[in-house]
Amino acid sequence: MPFSPDIIVTGEDTPRILLIVDAKLSSPSHPEYESQLKSYMLHMRCPTGLFVTPDAIVVYRDTYTAHSEKSVERVGLFPAPKTWTVFKVPHHGSELPSARDTHLEARFEETVKSWLEQVRNSPTDYLKEFPKETRDALTDYVVPALSQGVIRGSGPREWLESR
């Protein structure tokens, strides 16, 4: 299945993608996932990417130093907001999510989108709970994209089709 982010931030008056966000209930088990995210960022000329789970936020940035995935660097892995722990689910080794997990993943995606909107509207209030290193990374890479753009779901979701 080709990579597609869950949330995108585009310029207000342009289709340019400023930030992609992939929100999952757990880290993907296949190692090529990071490569797919980097490739998507590279091909869409997206400067910033996030992979978020209830446990962590991983920040990526494109340095535009090469025309390969090597130009997309992992800035760091940071703790997620404490309120996201309600979305933790046990992973039973199956790649196929249950109906309950699919519904929970949809709710998590909406929670992440809402959090991004809150950070955009009041970064100081919503970033103060994080350690300094996390605040700095989000302030340097994520807040500028949020302040310049519009936060959107990236398209139809599998969980919508199952309703």
Residue ranges with predicted function:
Residues 1-48, 58-163:
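A short, conserved, highly charged catalytic patch centered on acidic carboxylates
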